[in-house]
C-alpha cells in the first residue's frame, strides 16, 4: 500500500467583517463657498495599517482623506477609516504582507469611496467619484523604498 504524502497546510483567506471605524466631514467655509464658481482642486491622501488580532486574524484599516479647495479656500475635508477583519492563514511572510498591504485595501476601497461620495452629496457639494487605486503598485513601491533604505543604511 502506498504511503500517503504529507498534506501541506492549505492557505485560507476570508473576510470576517467590514466596518466603518471613523468618519469626519467638515465644510469650514460654507455657506459662502456655495456662492462661488465651482472649480475644485482635489487632494487625496491614503494610508493603510494592519495588526494581528489573534492567530491568523488581522485588522486592516484603510484611511482616506480628501481635501477639496475652491479658489484657494477649503470647500470640504472628508476623512474615512474603513476597517476590515480578515482571516489569513498558512501564508508565507511575503504573501501575508502583500495580502494585508494590497489585497485587503483593494477590498476596503470601494466601501470607503462610497462613504466619501455619500458624505460629499449630503454636504450639498457635487458628487465626488474617486478613481480606482492600484494598491498592488503602491505596495511594490513601498517594498522598493524599504529595500533602498536598507541599502543606504548598510
Swiss-Prot record:
Keywords attached to this Swiss-Prot or TrEMBL record, sorted alphabetically, are: Chaperone, Cytoplasm, Protein transport, Translocation, Transport
Question: Mind listing the GO biological process terms from this record?
Answer: protein folding; protein tetramerization; protein transport
Q: Does the keyword Hydrolase apply?
A: no
Localization terms from the record: Cytoplasm
What is the annotated quaternary arrangement, including any partners? Homotetramer, a dimer of dimers. One homotetramer interacts with 1 SecA dimer.
User: HAMAP family per the record?
Assistant: SecB
This chain's protein is named Protein-export protein SecB
Amino acid at each position: 500500500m502506498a504511503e500517503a504524502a504529507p498534506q501541506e497546510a492549505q492557505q485560507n483567506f476570508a473576510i470576517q467583517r467590514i466596518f466603518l471605524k471613523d468618519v469626519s466631514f467638515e465644510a469650514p467655509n460654507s455657506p459662502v463657498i456655495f456662492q462661488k464658481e465651482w472649480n475644485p482642486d482635489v487632494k487625496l491622501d491614503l494610508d493603510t495599517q494592519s495588526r494581528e488580532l489573534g492567530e491568523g486574524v488581522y485588522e486592516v484599516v484603510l484611511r482616506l482623506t480628501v481635501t477639496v479647495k475652491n479658489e484657494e479656500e477649503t470647500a470640504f475635508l472628508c476623512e474615512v477609516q474603513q476597517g476590515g477583519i480578515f482571516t489569513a492563514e498558512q501564508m508565507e511572510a511575503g504573501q501575508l504582507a502583500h495580502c494585508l498591504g494590497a489585497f485587503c485595501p483593494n477590498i476596503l476601497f470601494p466601501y470607503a469611496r462610497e462613504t466619501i461620495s455619500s458624505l460629499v452629496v449630503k454636504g450639498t457639494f457635487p458628487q465626488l467619484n474617486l478613481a480606482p487605486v492600484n494598491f498592488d503598485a503602491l505596495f511594490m513601491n513601498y517594498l522598493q523604498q524599504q529595500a533602498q533604505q536598507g541599502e543606504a543604511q548598510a
